[in-house]
A protein has these predicted regions:
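Acidic/polar low-complexity segments with low predicted structural confidence
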Residues: 1-98
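Phosphate/oxyanion-binding active-site loops and adjacent basic polyanion-contact surfaces
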Residues: 46, 50, 116-123, 166-174, ...
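DG-centered beta-turn motif at the end of beta-strands
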Residues: 54, 104-109, 191-206
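Surface-exposed acidic, glycine-flexible loop patches that form ligand/cofactor-binding
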Residues: 93-95, 133-135, 182-189, 215-217
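Von Willebrand factor
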Residues: 93-194, 205
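Short acidic, S/G/P-rich loop/turn micro-motifs used as interaction or catalytic elements
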Residues: 111-113, 150-151, 200-205, 231-234
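Von Willebrand factor type A / integrin I
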Residues: 213-281
Length: 281
């Protein structure tokens, strides 16, 4: 999966001219060193490796001819040399941490079915692949689903396949991300990206709570990308999410951190890729 995503990210970046990240932020280098008892040394060290020491003592006494009958061994007759003692010693190991953490958010309420969900998920797969290439595979993912309540799910399969028949409160997904980031202090170690896919429905018509959570997110987020995939029956009307994102002025106020893309449900891959360019430009 990781190798395939990286290759797709390379193709998206090179063949489809998706932009390269010029500056990944202050958290670009997240290699650290840890010390583990992985190396062994004879004679001196921190912790005696009893099994390895016993093996070495037996080998020494076999070589000296002090074990004539291997089926009748008396440990009291062993000669023990200081060089037979095997110790584990601390070794400096390089531990790479992920540079980017991506939250994928998806409305899975009753109205999110068929082509709309497929378009959202396809775009999110491509976004993940692009980031894998940009960050040289150092990417972690978290998956959030929401209807009137938000929940985190463990993997992409659940993220893609789960659905319910409830209504929609968009703010719950953004609030959950904020709560997770603050509780786990994730902004300290990661460049954080948030991508939300929806059909534009929201019971919170003026988006007051959603806008509050987005403002709260601006403290740490590298990019928020909102994709609205409209049902064909919407026509020329604006969805609730489009209305309040545009009328609030938040897209202009935070133009370097939040982007909006709107597309119809009958999209092909080329249009999805054009949407990605808009979200990450």
């Amino acid at each position: 999966m990781e190798a395939n995503a990286y290759e797709l990210g390379r193709v998206l970046s090179q063949d489809f001219q998706l932009p390269n990240l010029k500056d990944k932020g202050k958290k670009r280098s997240l290699a650290r060193y840890v010390y583990e008892l992985t190396d062994k040394n004879k004679g001196v060290g921190q912790i005696l490796d009893k099994k390895a020491t016993l093996r070495q003592i037996v080998q020494t006494n076999l070589a000296l001819g002090r074990i004539p009958n291997v089926s009748d061994i008396n440990p009291a007759d062993f000669l023990v040399s200081p060089h037979d003692l095997v110790y584990r010693i601390l070794s400096r190991e390089k531990d790479f941490e992920s540079q980017a953490l991506v939250f994928f958010l998806r409305d899975y309420s009753g109205s999110m079915g068929g082509k709309v969900t497929q378009a959202v998920v396809s775009q999110h797969v491509m976004l993940y692949s692009w980031l894998m290439y940009q960050y040289e595979k150092q990417v972690e993912t978290r998956f959030i689903l929401h209807d009137t309540e938000a929940r985190e799910v463990a993997d992409f399969y659940k993220y893609h396949s789960y659905k319910v028949a409830g209504g929609t409160k968009v703010f719950t997904a953004f609030k959950l991300v904020n709560d997770i980031v603050e509780r786990e202090n994730l902004d300290r170690d990661y460049n954080i990206y948030v991508f939300h896919g929806t059909d534009g429905d929201d019971w919170d018509k003026d988006g007051k709570q959603t806008l509050e959570e987005i403002e709260r997110m601006m403290r740490y987020v590298a990019r928020i990308g909102v994709s609205i995939v409209e049902h064909s029956y919407v026509g020329s009307k604006q969805t609730e999410v489009e209305k309040y994102l545009k009328s609030s002025g938040i897209l202009e106020k935070h133009k370097d951190h939040i982007k909006l893309d709107i597309m119809g449900e009958n999209v092909d891959d080329s249009r999805i890729i054009q949407g990605i360019k808009k979200l990450i430009s």
